UniProtKB/Swiss-Prot annotation:
NCBIfam families from the UniProt entry: PRK10714.1 (NF007986)
Main location: membrane
Record key words, sorted: Antibiotic resistance, Cell inner membrane, Cell membrane, Glycosyltransferase, Lipid A biosynthesis, Lipid biosynthesis, Lipid metabolism, Lipopolysaccharide biosynthesis, Membrane, Transferase, Transmembrane, Transmembrane helix
GO MF terms, alphabetically ordered: phosphotransferase activity, for other substituted phosphate groups; undecaprenyl-phosphate 4-deoxy-4-formamido-L-arabinose transferase activity
Matches recorded under PANTHER family: UNDECAPRENYL-PHOSPHATE 4-DEOXY-4-FORMAMIDO-L-ARABINOSE TRANSFERASE, UNDECAPRENYL-PHOSPHATE 4-DEOXY-4-FORMAMIDO-L-ARABINOSE TRANSFERASE-RELATED
Purpose: Catalyzes the transfer of 4-deoxy-4-formamido-L-arabinose from UDP to undecaprenyl phosphate. The modified arabinose is attached to lipid A and is required for resistance to polymyxin and cationic antimicrobial peptides.
Name of the featured protein: Undecaprenyl-phosphate 4-deoxy-4-formamido-L-arabinose transferase
SUPFAM superfamilies registered for this protein in UniProt: Nucleotide-diphospho-sugar transferases
Family statement drawn from the similarity comment of this UniProt entry: Belongs to the glycosyltransferase 2 family.
Domain of life from the UniProt record: Bacteria
Tagged with keyword Transmembrane: yes
InterPro entries assigned: ArnC_tfrase, Glyco_trans_2-like, Glycosyltransferase_2, Nucleotide-diphossugar_trans
């Protein structure tokens, strides 16, 4: 594929989970931004098993006769990245843009992403300026970004921002990957030849709360560690070797001290011995837990169950007809 291949159609993929308050504004603003494009466009909204009225709102929007919206309804909640992959499976554009439904990243940035992608980039990432999140979220995001950069060698500054643009061949490459734990920005960068980042505005969340709770962030960190690299397993081997060497040295030292100071001294060191023993046992359990994480992910991948199940797609044929009329 030529690096400067023209973009004839843009697909916007937006995962939605319990966002009924923000959906009307999201649809209006995204549609208005897309109308500024010179290319044809489609807006794919993926309902990730919402329990509020999001499903009904998406269905109504996709059934609008003048709409460019496709609604993909999943049968339950599978997670943000699985929902985006479901959207990727439906896209027909040459450039695919992902966007969160909470409106913290403005849809009005869409034309900028398209313009930058036309310069020949495979992936256009974004960095949130003046980020409007809690200190906890900012700190957690900073730690995750540093970990990703060290593991991948890609020095992109904000992997947590989902407002990103991907060329179609990058999306097709990602669709050929069937692992269960998928972090799309990282996966895309493994296939991209040319990447760049632009700074975008970041607004406060107007409706509801973030879907990433503390436990979800911890699970995300485990996912990233185990799906990115096998470095933790290598570190375990090094730590295990160091502990074994330390244990051997400590044993020799205890024997020497017993010979020098007699059996009375050895009795006084029982608590020290137990403390060191518990430290070694604790390290072993940590290692076993990490190894179990890897084995569990291998087990999930070997079962080859689908990432998601699409219950219904609304508006696909209608969107194609609207594109033909505009041509």
């Amino acid at each position: 594929m030529s690096l400067n291949e023209p973009i004839k159609k843009v697909s916007i993929v937006i995962p939605v989970y319990n966002e009924q308050e923000s959906l009307p504004a999201l649809i209006d603003r995204t549609t208005a931004a897309c109308k500024l494009l010179t290319q044809a466009y489609e807006i794919i909204l993926v309902d990730d098993g919402s329990s509020d009225n999001s499903t009904e709102l998406l269905t109504a929007a996709a059934n609008d006769p003048d709409s460019h919206i496709i609604a993909i309804l999943l049968n339950r909640n599978y997670g943000q990245h699985s929902a985006i992959m479901a959207g990727f499976n439906q896209v027909s554009g040459d450039l695919i843009i992902t966007l969160d439904a909470d409106l913290q990243n403005p849809p009005e940035e869409t034309p900028r992403l398209v313009h930058v992608a036309e310069e020949g980039y495979d992936v256009v990432g974004t960095v949130r300026a003046n980020r409007q999140d809690s200190l906890f979220r900012k700190t957690a995001s900073r730690m995750i970004n540093m970990m990703i950069q060290r593991a991948t060698g890609k020095s992109m500054g904000d992997y947590g921002c989902m407002l990103r643009a991907y060329r179609r061949h990058i999306v097709e490459a990602m669709l050929h990957c069937h692992e269960r734990s998928t972090f799309i920005p990282i996966l895309a960068n493994t296939f991209a030849r040319r990447t760049t980042e632009i700074t975008v505005h970041h607004a406060e969340r107007e409706f509801g709360n973030s879907k990433y709770s503390l436990m979800r962030l911890i699970n995300l960190m485990y996912d990233l560690i185990t799906c990115l690299t096998t470095t933790p397993l290598r570190l375990l081997s090094l730590v295990g070797s160091a502990i074994a060497l330390l244990g051997f040295t400590f044993s020799v030292l205890l024997v020497a001290l017993r010979l020098i100071f007699g059996p009375e001294w050895a009795g006084g060191g029982v608590f020290t011995l137990f403390a060191v023993l518990f430290m070694f046992i604790g390290a072993q359990f940590v290692g076993m837990g990490l190894l179990g994480e890897y084995i569990g992910r291998i087990y999930n991948d070997v079962r080859a169950r689908p990432r998601y199940f699409v219950q219904k797609v609304v508006g696909a044929e209608q969107t194609e007809n609207n594109q033909d009329v505009e041509k």
